[in-house]
Amino acid sequence: MINDIKKQSEQKMKKSMEALGHAFAKIRTGRANPAILESVMVSYYGTDTPLTQIANVVVEDARTLSVTPWEKNMVPQIEKAILKSDLGLNPSTAGTVIRVPMPALTEETRKELVKTARGEAENTRVAIRNLRRDANADIKTLLKDKEISEDEEKRGLDDIQKLTDKYIAEVDRVLAEKEKDLMAV
């Protein structure tokens, strides 16, 4: 029973880490990363559609993304959608290919992005702690229902704490890496 709680908690903590990874991928570092354009919505036959579903987005070089729409007539809408997004990107069109250069980050922008990254990391830490709280409550319920002994409860709580510490340390490591990435000129 305790093992089930531990496995469930670990799976949820892994999901929290994956969510943090996705959030960090969307924070631009000045280097080209296709994930930056995942949030861009394009009006596709009257429906807002994610850019990644109507075009191929690839890294052309370290500072440029190349967007190739699957339908040539979508080029103007895609360009407009990228301009309207709050990403601060300025696309240029060459035939059916849209090139999106990544602007160099100013010191002020870097600091703002670091703040955003820290906020995302803190949200993930809170989520992990909430998962710990839930797992601990489940273990204490098992003790109250006399399904486990006090020793098993203590061992279970310790294991959940170790799991929490491991994932919080992982959040800190990923955040430090992202900050280093953002502050590199």
Swiss-Prot record:
Keyword Chaperone attributed: no
**Any idea what job this protein has?**
Responsible for the release of ribosomes from messenger RNA at the termination of protein biosynthesis. May increase the efficiency of translation by recycling ribosomes from one round of translation to another.
In Swiss-Prot or TrEMBL terms, this protein is called: Ribosome-recycling factor
Q: Where does this one sit in the cell?
A: Cytoplasm
For this UniProt record, the keywords arranged alphabetically read as follows:
Cytoplasm, Protein biosynthesis
Q: Name one GO cellular component term.
A: cytosol
Q: Which domain of life is it from?
A: Bacteria
Q: Which organism is it from?
A: Hahella chejuensis (strain KCTC 2396)
Protein biosynthesis among keywords: yes
Q: What family does this chain come from, according to its entry?
A: Belongs to the RRF family.
For this UniProt entry, the molecular function terms from Gene Ontology, in alphabetical order, are: ribosomal large subunit binding
Gene3D superfamilies according to UniProt: 3.30.1360.40, Ribosome-recycling factor
Query: Which PANTHER family is this protein grouped with?
Result: MITOCHONDRIAL RIBOSOME RECYCLING FACTOR PSEUDO 1, RIBOSOME RECYCLING FACTOR
Q: What is its main location?
A: cytoplasm
